[in-house]
UniProtKB/Swiss-Prot annotation:
A cellular-component GO term for this protein: U4/U6 x U5 tri-snRNP complex
Family as reported in the entry's similarity comment: Belongs to the PRP18 family.
Functional description taken from the UniProt entry: Participates in the second step of pre-mRNA splicing. Down-regulates the expression of potassium channel subunits.
Protein's name according to its UniProt entry: Pre-mRNA-splicing factor 18
Disulfide bond sites: none
Source organism: Rattus norvegicus (Rat)
Length: 342
């Protein structure tokens, strides 16, 4: 008992020496005792203990951009310049501001991603976007109203006026595939835009109640979607940078369409879209030995519909125009694909 009493007395004396208990306070925190012991240890070792003042602490900001600038001011550039440009363009931001370096653009991208994360989630549904655009046009017409006697053109689609006829295009088609690539591209562009105009005029000639129906909206949205799908193809044709294999296949398709040989045009389309290569995506070597069918793996036999999403879209748009061409410019049933199915 004497040993226990002496230990209690020693502990009590230690607390009094440390000044842990002030007036009207019956307890203390163990962290305070540890802090006092640490200070006493430093004093015995000859170190000077500088008290930390709360006023010297930097104020924390609720703005994540300011916190990023303070904490990661010299963050290394972890993305390539091409990736930074791609991400900025996806978010509708300029790829470079005036006087901005590559590192500054990278830092700007990080701030944008922190403030507005995930602008576009997943792949966009093009058909739904076209339908929403048609619905928005109807809403604008309802809100804006219409004057009596005014012609209703709110529901009409844009028509490409090519100022040409099918007879003139058929005459031009005789010179397709003769070696003049620039002339072939001009004829292809003119004919595809002519078909888009024919399709739009057909849809615009419908009654108003048909345009407003579910099926009518779907048909209008399909035409708008096809037009947007073909824009990359028109751009390549205008800039003369369409790949040679794609250009050759499309030339054959257009030539057969102008001759109203729709079965042959469909065969040429399948040859371009699907191909007949044993490795349609373009595998060139498996293992250490060349395969027996390797000589067939070149651009003419590759399935172009598998190359990328842009090619898949304008190939699909081309097939829709083939159907429209057969519908408006019929021929013998033996030369048609799915005769009377339209």
């Amino acid at each position: 008992m004497d040993i226990l009493k002496s230990e209690i007395l020693r502990k009590r004396q230690l607390v009094e020496d440390r000044n842990l208990l002030v007036e009207n306070k019956k307890y203390f925190k163990r962290s305070e005792l540890a802090k006092k012991e640490e200070e006493a240890y430093f004093e015995r070792c000859g170190y000077k203990v500088q008290p930390k003042e709360d006023d010297q602490k930097p104020l924390t900001s609720s703005n994540p951009v300011l916190e990023l600038e303070l904490a990661e001011e010299k963050l290394p550039m972890t993305l390539s310049r091409q990736e930074v440009i791609r991400r900025l363009r996806e978010r509708g931001e300029p790829m470079r501001l005036f006087g901005e370096t590559d590192y500054d653009a990278f830092q700007r991208l990080r701030k944008i991603e922190i403030l507005t994360p995930e602008v576009n989630k997943g792949l966009r549904n093009d058909l739904k976007a076209a339908l929403d655009k048609i619905d928005q046009q109807y809403l604008n017409e309802i809100v804006g109203g219409q004057e009596p006697g005014e012609e209703d053109t709110q529901n009409d689609l844009k028509v490409h006026e090519e100022n040409t006829t099918i007879e003139e295009l058929e005459a031009l088609g005789e010179s397709l595939g003769k070696g003049d690539d620039h002339k072939d591209m001009d004829i292809i562009t003119k004919f595809l835009k002519f078909l888009l105009g024919v399709w739009a005029k057909e849809l615009n000639s419908r009654e108003d109640y048909v345009k407003r129906s579910v099926q009518g909206k779907l048909n209008s949205a399909t035409q708008k979607q096809t037009e947007s799908y073909l824009r990359p193809l028109f751009r390549k044709l205008r800039k003369r940078n369409l790949p040679a294999d794609i250009k050759e296949s499309i030339t054959d398709i257009i030539k057969f369409m102008l001759q109203r040989e729709y079965v042959k045009a469909n065969d040429a389309y399948l040859q371009m879209a699907i191909g007949n290569a044993p490795w349609p995506i373009g595998v060139t070597m498996v293992g250490i030995h060349a395969r027996t069918g390797r000589e067939k793996i070149f651009s003419k036999h590759v399935a172009h519909v598998l190359n990328d999403e842009t090619q898949r879209k304008y190939i699909q748009g081309l097939k829709r125009l083939m159907t429209i061409c057969q519908k408006h410019f019929p021929t013998d049933p033996s030369k048609c694909v799915e005769y009377n199915a339209l």
